[in-house]
Structure formats: structure tokens, C-alpha cells
């Protein structure tokens, strides 16, 4: 469902944009619990309130005569943002967040290529924990968490609970092995900053699908909170020695 208020003269095929986006993310089959080609798309858009538009079309500073280009566009409401810029990375994002995003991007690339880890499905998330010294400098990567949705690619030998448990354990072992031997080498190969490469070591703890089997996911498994809360997704928030950040694909 697409809901909201907008004022525009453009003629936009919103249902088709929604379908194309869902398919591009990877939900293109009913076997995955959601199919962008056949799902219902309900559009409930209305014209933006004229009262709100007054604040958006022209900022308060511009109305008061402050001649600044940045003040040409206003805001119709308040929002809360949390984060900071840092020189840990070239894009000024905290290193933990940058690595989390990189892991998920490479994981999505592998899924779309369809040559390795062919059991992958779109829903995934990652968390990276980094150890810092007393000067706030990253010294090593402590923990990497990768949770990824997957096909039910190993079937139990029979209908018993023990057989199902064995199949689930074999799937988890395969995913863990592939994350360490296929995903992470490609992630590391995509990094060019020597100071970041030096943080990888043999002592990194990997948690791969730590809750177990992850077949049901995406829109079919979770409605999510995005757009229905003031703030939950943040970056930054560094603690004393260990600093974590997570990210989700697409």
C-alpha cells in the first residue's frame, strides 16, 4: 500500500514503479512469499495540505528575508536525525556502518549473479563490532554477524523431527562455510584502504544466521516499522571500546 500526500504535475505510474522495485529487490516468485509481478498494489495518495505546503515551499528564514540559497526549501514538520561524520572512512560514515553496508552489498551481488550461494533470498542484515583503543582509533574487527534469508535447499530424509533438525543444521553449516569462504574474501577484496584491511584477522568471531533457519522473511515474514516510528535506525553512537552498527539490504 502506497499512502501519503504529494503535490505534483507529473503523471507517475506508481503501481508499476512499486512492482519494478519489488522485483529488482528480488521478490519475484510466490515461492519466496512475495511476487512483485502479481501482488496487489493499493495507492491512496492525496494532495498535500495547503497549510503544510506553505512551510515546504518556502523556509521560515526565506520568509523573514534571510537571503540564503539553502533556505529556499522549507520543512512541513519536525524530524529527528542521529549520526555523525568521521574520518574513519572515505565517505565519512562510521567504519562499522560502512563495513555492514559493504557486506550486504556484496551479498546482494552474489545473489543476483546466481553462480554461487544460489540458495540466497533478498532479506538480510549485518552487524560489525569493532574494538577501539583509548584514543578512539579502530584496532581490530571483533565480531561480524550475517543473517540471510535462504531457500529450504536441504530436505529432511523423512518426516521426523530429528530428520528436520539434521537438515536445518546442514543448511546452517553450508551457509556459514560460504559466508566465510565466498562472501568475506570478496568483501575484503573490495576494500582498498590499508588501514581498514589491517583490521581483519583470524580472531574475528562470525555469527551466521545465529537464530537458525531463515526461510520465511521479507514482506511475508515481517511488516517492519519503517515509516511508522520517529527513530529506530541510527548510525554512530560509539561506546567505550566496542561499537556496533547494523544495516539491512535494500
Describe the residue ranges of each PLM region.
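Histidine-centered divalent-metal-coordination microenvironment in nucleic-acid enzymes
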Residues: 1, 145, 228-231
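Short, charge-patterned binding micro-sites
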Residues: 1-8
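N-terminal low-complexity, intrinsically disordered segments
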Residues: 13-19, 50-56, 219
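A glycine-rich helix N-cap at a beta->alpha junction
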Residues: 19-30
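Glycine-rich, mobile lid/loop segments that gate access to catalytic sites or pores
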Residues: 27, 36-216
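A glycine-rich, aromatic-flanked flexible loop/lid motif
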Residues: 223-242
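Conserved small/polar residues in nucleotide/adenosyl-binding loops
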Residues: 243-248
Amino acid at each position: 500500500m502506497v499512502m501519503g500526500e504529494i503535490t505534483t504535475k507529473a503523471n507517475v505510474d506508481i503501481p508499476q514503479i512499486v512492482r519494478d522495485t519489488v522485483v529488482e529487490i528480488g521478490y519475484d516468485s510466490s515461492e519466496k512469499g512475495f511476487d512483485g509481478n502479481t501482488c496487489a498494489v493499493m495507492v491512496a495518495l492525496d494532495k498535500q495540505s495547503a497549510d503544510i505546503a506553505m512551510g515546504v515551499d518556502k523556509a521560515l528564514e526565506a520568509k523573514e528575508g534571510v537571503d540564503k540559497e539553502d533556505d529556499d526549501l522549507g520543512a512541513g514538520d519536525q524530524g529527528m536525525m542521529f549520526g555523525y561524520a568521521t574520518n574513519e572512512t572515505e565517505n565519512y560514515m562510521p567504519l562499522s556502518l560502512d563495513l555492514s553496508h559493504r557486506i550486504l552489498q556484496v551479498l546482494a551481488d552474489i545473489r543476483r549473479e546466481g553462480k554461487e550461494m544460489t540458495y540466497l533470498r533478498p532479506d538480510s542484515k549485518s552487524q560489525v563490532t569493532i574494538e577501539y583503543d583509548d584514543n578512539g582509533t579502530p584496532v581490530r574487527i571483533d565480531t561480524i554477524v550475517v543473517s540471510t534469508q535462504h531457500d529450504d535447499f536441504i530436505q529432511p530424509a523423512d518426516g521426523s523431527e530429528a530428520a528436520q533438525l539434521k537438515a536445518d543444521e546442514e543448511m546452517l553449516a553450508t551457509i556459514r562455510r560460504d559466508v566465510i569462504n565466498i562472501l568475506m574474501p570478496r568483501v575484503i577484496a573490495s576494500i582498498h584502504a590499508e588501514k581498514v584491511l589491517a583490521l581483519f584477522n583470524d580472531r574475528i568471531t562470525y555469527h551466521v544466521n545465529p537464530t537458525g533457519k531463515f526461510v520465511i522473511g521479507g514482506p511475508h515474514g515481517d511488516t517492519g516499522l519503517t515509516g511508522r516510528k520517529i527513530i529506530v535506525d541510527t548510525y554512530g553512537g560509539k561506546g567505550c571500546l566496542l561499537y556496533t552498527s547494523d544495516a539491512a539490504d535494500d
